[in-house]
A protein has these predicted regions:
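Internal maturation/activation junctions in enzymes
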Residues: 20, 81-85, 96-138, 322-337
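Conserved small/polar residues in nucleotide/adenosyl-binding loops
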Residues: 339-345
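Active-site-adjacent bridging/hinge elements
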Residues: 33-45, 64, 142-145, 230-243, ...
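A short core secondary-structure module
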Residues: 142, 146-200
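Amphipathic, small/basic residue-rich leader segments at the start of a protein or domain
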Residues: 1-80, 99, 103
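Extended amphipathic alpha-helical segments enriched in small hydrophobics
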Residues: 250-331
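A glycine-rich, basic-preceded beta-loop-alpha segment at the flavin cofactor/substrate interface
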Residues: 151, 190-206, 211, 218-249, ...
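Short Gly/Pro-enriched turn/cap motifs at secondary-structure boundaries
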Residues: 123-126, 156-158, 175, 211-217
């Protein structure tokens, strides 16, 4: 809470006014973002809800979500950088080989590397069966990935040593439509023999979007030019595997609504306590001032309580779902049924 209040919250305005800066060499995040991420990593926060086997703390998903709510309420733009890594970790953990888990999870869990989700292309978003990004098999068992992905949140930045892209692509002999999609790990830098950052891969950011909001987070056009990729899961079953990432993102999207609702409520109640206007119907509440704060007026209180009710309702559903995700790990049938309802695959 102290980190969110004292470090992230002040950077929210900085991120919104300054935004990200694109150049051919990469993306520069707003002033202070990189330093805040360093503190976040040093505090061990990225590892909170991940397995101890890969350096995590092994705590419940619901506890990790509580931390993410504080981060997101303080600074959603900043929080998306480590937030998307969570989905990448879950996907590699669920579908990656033992070697892939060894290579990528320790770095992602520690926060040294971050992750992204690369689905959308210029000609297709919701209809992923139309995607054109190609994956050509190579003699060494890797794949050559070629194509363009758009609207990639945190696709390029200067906050971590490496960025691990989880990419949907199509094999040469793949069936048409969604039944012919495969999933790949495509890192910005290829890992070296020691597990650190090696040579640059054929991945680059072509531009960043100029958005209405969340200016502090880079929403990128990502170009894959014969980039080396590694298959996750079975061929042509990539969309099934990607649903692991998408369900993590669904919880994150719900959390975004909660974070903004909570922040809006906090701002509104602060203003209502400061803004003076007329007197209370039951007599002066601030007789030493020219008028009473508007929080004393019934209609203002009604609006504030409505805001609070929506935020609390959202919070209840998000945390209940996260709790069911935790219980699912122990194969409880009722929890499985509930998550199939709220996080459909």
């Amino acid at each position: 809470a102290k980190f969110c209040e004292q470090v992230l919250s002040p950077l929210n305005r900085v991120g919104d006014t300054e935004g990200c800066t694109w150049s051919e060499s990469g993306v520069k995040t707003p002033t202070g973002f990189k330093e805040a991420y360093k503190q976040f990593v040093e505090g061990g926060w990225p590892s909170l809800a991940h397995d101890a086997e890969h350096g995590g703390q092994g705590l419940p998903e619901s506890l990790g979500l509580a931390v993410s709510e504080m981060v997101g309420t303080a600074n959603w733009s900043w929080g998306m950088y480590p937030g998307l890594s969570h989905g990448a970790m879950n996907t590699i953990s669920a579908h990656g080989t033992a070697e892939q888990q060894h290579t990528y999870l320790t770095k992602l869990v520690s926060g040294e590397w971050t992750g992204t989700m690369c689905l959308t292309e210029p000609h297709c978003g919701t209809d992923l069966g139309m995607l054109r990004t190609k994956a050509e098999p190579q003699a060494d068992g890797s794949y050559s990935i070629s194509g363009t992905k758009i609207f990639i949140s945190a696709g390029e930045h200067d906050m971590a040593d490496n960025i691990v892209h989880i990419v949907l692509a199509r094999l040469p002999d793949a069936p048409a439509g969604t039944k012919g999609i495969s999933l790949f790990i495509v890192p910005k830098f290829l890992p070296n023999a020691e597990g650190g950052v090696g040579e640059r891969n054929g991945v680059s950011c072509g531009s960043i979007e100029h958005k209405m909001g969340i200016h502090g987070n880079a929403t990128c056009v990502m170009n894959f030019d014969s980039a080396t990729g590694f298959l996750i899961g079975p061929p042509n079953k990539g969309l099934n595997c990607m649903f692991t990432f998408m369900n993590t993102a669904r919880l994150g999207t719900a959390l975004q609504g909660l974070a903004h609702a909570e922040l809006g409520f906090q701002g509104a109640i602060k203003y209502a306590r400061e803004r003076l206007q007329m007197r209370s119907l039951t007599g002066p509440k601030a007789p030493d001032k020219a008028a009473d704060p508007i929080i004393v007026h019934p209609d203002v209180r009604r609006m504030l309580l409505t805001m609070k009710a929506f935020a609390e309702g959202n919070r209840a559903m998000v945390y209940f779902t996260a709790k069911q995700v935790d219980i699912v790990k122990y194969a409880q049938d009722e929890a499985v049924s509930y998550t199939h309802l709220t996080l459909p695959t």
